[in-house]
């Protein structure tokens, strides 16, 4: 099969701008909070709470990867951002799976291998 060209950087830029606008709108009434990365734990539960399938996926990842409560919150923040980039109102299982995969890469031994 023929390789598909990647998404043009102009399209990526547009998605990022729209995601940032969603975040600014979400937090417009909360002083000092402008983006998902700044969410408190309470805000994470309000704005990034996954459905039951997502919660089960996250629990399984927490156990298998031995992740901390802090890592749990970081995964939810990243998943919320992925959902924003896709224009989704709610965090879905696929957003969590992607966020978990980034966390798993973060924990891998890439540095040991010099990669």
Which residues make up each language-model segment?
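Basic, amphipathic alpha-helical bundle interface domains used for macromolecular binding and assembly
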Residues: 1-109
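Acidic, low-complexity intrinsically disordered tails
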Residues: 110-114
């Amino acid at each position: 099969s023929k390789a598909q060209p990647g998404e043009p950087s102009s399209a990526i830029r547009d998605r990022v701008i729209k995601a940032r606008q969603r975040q600014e709108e979400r937090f417009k009434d909360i002083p000092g909070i402008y983006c998902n990365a700044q969410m408190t734990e309470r805000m994470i539960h309000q704005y990034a709470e996954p459905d039951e399938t997502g919660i089960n996926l996250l629990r399984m990842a927490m156990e298998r990867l031995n992740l901390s409560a802090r890592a749990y919150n970081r995964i939810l923040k990243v998943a919320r951002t992925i959902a924003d980039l896709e224009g989704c109102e709610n965090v879905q299982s696929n957003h969590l799976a992607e966020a978990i995969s980034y966390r798993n890469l973060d924990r891998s031994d890439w540095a040991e291998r010099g990669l």
